[in-house]
Amino acid sequence: MNSRSGYIHIILGPMFSGKSTELIRLLKRYQVAMYTCLVIKYSKDERYGRGLVTHDNDSVPAIPVNSLNEINCNDINADVIGIDEGQFFPDIVEFCDYMANNGKILIVAALDGTFLRQPFGNILNLIPRAEYVLKLTAVCMICFGSASFSKRISDEQEIEIIGGKEKYQSVCRVCYFKINN
């Protein structure tokens, strides 16, 4: 373990809840404080090119990878590591735990549940190892109440379908169970 204290900060929530926006906000705050930051994004999310881009078009440069083990942990010189779409990385727990134990600050933005309201990937296993966990809500795109869930509105049945408003809605509990929107 490194003598400098690292930690893990997780930002969870449904689609359109501002997870990536909050991740970028925190990263920019660390940059103002003269911390060096590295941003990692899921390589199969090609909606906005190589960088991390929010639905509001705020952006930061990012390294696209399929798996976190593609990154040589010993070569990371950054103080802070931001990871977007953390639910897609099967090695998220081991990577974050190792890096935090070696003095790095990890900020992970991720969906907590699938469109079926099931745990998404390995991300919930990271919670017991995290110092900070924030669960955001969105606005229900049907009734405009508070939304905690992502509902797929396209016909695909695979868990990993990357998309935006053309494929998903943020919904509340009541609207999640409505058949026709």
Curated annotation (Swiss-Prot):
One Pfam family of this chain: TK
Family annotation (SUPFAM superfamilies): Glucocorticoid receptor-like (DNA-binding domain), P-loop containing nucleoside triphosphate hydrolases
Binding site for Zn(2+): C140, C143, C172, C175
Protein's name in the database: Thymidine kinase
Keywords in alphabetical order: ATP-binding, DNA synthesis, Kinase, Metal-binding, Nucleotide-binding, Transferase, Zinc
Binding annotation for substrate: F115, I159, E160, I161, I162, G163
Family: Belongs to the thymidine kinase family.
EC number: 2.7.1.21
EC category: transferase
Binding site for ATP: G13, P14, M15, F16, S17, G18, K19, S20
Entry-linked InterPro entries: P-loop_NTPase, Thymidine_kinase, Thymidine_kinase_CS
Catalytic residues identified in the record: E85
UniProt keyword Kinase present: yes
Species, as recorded: Yaba monkey tumor virus (strain VR587) (YMTV)
GO molecular function, one term: thymidine kinase activity
Catalyzed reactions per annotation: thymidine + ATP = dTMP + ADP + H(+)
Biological process terms in GO annotation: DNA biosynthetic process; thymidine metabolic process
